[in-house]
Amino acid sequence: MLVLAIETSCDETAAALVRDGRSILSSVVSSQVKDHAVYGGVVPEIASRKHLETIPAVIGEALRLADVTLDHVEGVAVTQGPGLAGALLVGLSVAKSIAFARRLPLVGVNHIEAHLAAIFLEREVAYPYLALVVSGGHSHLYRVDGIGRCTTLGQTLDDAAGEAFDKVAKLLGLPYPGGIEIDRLASAGDPDAIAFPRPLLHDGSFNFSFSGLKTAVLSAVKKQGLPEGKSLADFCASFQKAVCHVLVEKTFRAAEAAGIDRVVVAGGVACNSALRREMAHAAAARGVELMIPSPSLCGDNAAMIAVPGDYYLRCGEQGGLALDARVNWPLDLLGSGREG
């Protein structure tokens, strides 16, 4: 089955043509980073307007690169949530229009479930596996027993990891997106220069909390002033190590508790070089199989939407014109929240 997938949950406008939920014929992502950089973060209204301006060209380019037309498409999959309401509605409206005009089946996809399934675009993974999704809005641990069969084991109680990276970067006066800049600066720093706290590391749960770490950073800046040069690199490296330490330890503790020896890490923060490195070291030490998608599949993209989309379309599921944006759409065991 050839699926046209569309993703507009936040500030990336993306479209992809994927065959059988595995083979990427094309994947186009248009970033809005420059549009939001001046504000230091994503502005929902601007994101929606940019999606409206960009999505026709993005879909057209995806079709061109795949060397197909809409006549070849057999189904449409679109991000239904979670995400920004206005942004989601742009993608949904376009997907509905195409599906209606072409009489194609249409299915809504959970953005987070798509992150969990992105690894299948590069390799097959046996179920069950333990998955960590780390992004600007999520730091969640899941047991994955199949598409539509996800159980939440732990989640962020306040700031997600990606949000913490961006907020700390803003405190330090770094450009947006802050997570990338912290990773870059940290490569030249000493990760043991500052002993930042590890929130909830020993609380016995698999939940995360990064607001306290953010407060510790703010206190350090107020006490010492804004770091510069080598001190800034050390500061970034120490903060990054604290975040990665908690993510790594809780992930593998959860895997051990669940009796699972396969771990998948996904989401935009999975692009972070230190996290990828520390996850690899921890997996090797524990004899656990670690799988992290290529960076292009960790950030928001439409190709990953096609993986669960293809599955649900084959199961005969159709959302039709009734599909609406689901700003909050938690995964759970019952159909990955599709009925929740």
From Swiss-Prot:
A GO term, aspect molecular function: N(6)-L-threonylcarbamoyladenine synthase activity
The keyword tRNA processing is annotated on this UniProt entry: yes
Membrane spanning stretches: none
Amino-acid positions noted as binding Fe cation in the UniProt annotation, renumbered to this chain: 111, 115, 300
Textual note on the cofactor: Binds 1 Fe(2+) ion per subunit.
Location in or out of the cell: Cytoplasm
CDD domains in UniProt: ASKHA_NBD_TsaD_bac (cd24133)
Record-listed substrate binding positions: 133-137, 166, 179, 183, 272
Function: Required for the formation of a threonylcarbamoyl group on adenosine at position 37 (t(6)A37) in tRNAs that read codons beginning with adenine. Is involved in the transfer of the threonylcarbamoyl moiety of threonylcarbamoyl-AMP (TC-AMP) to the N6 group of A37, together with TsaE and TsaB. TsaD likely plays a direct catalytic role in this reaction.
Similarity remark: Belongs to the KAE1 / TsaD family.
Full protein name: tRNA N6-adenosine threonylcarbamoyltransferase
Organism: Geobacter sulfurreducens (strain ATCC 51573 / DSM 12127 / PCA)
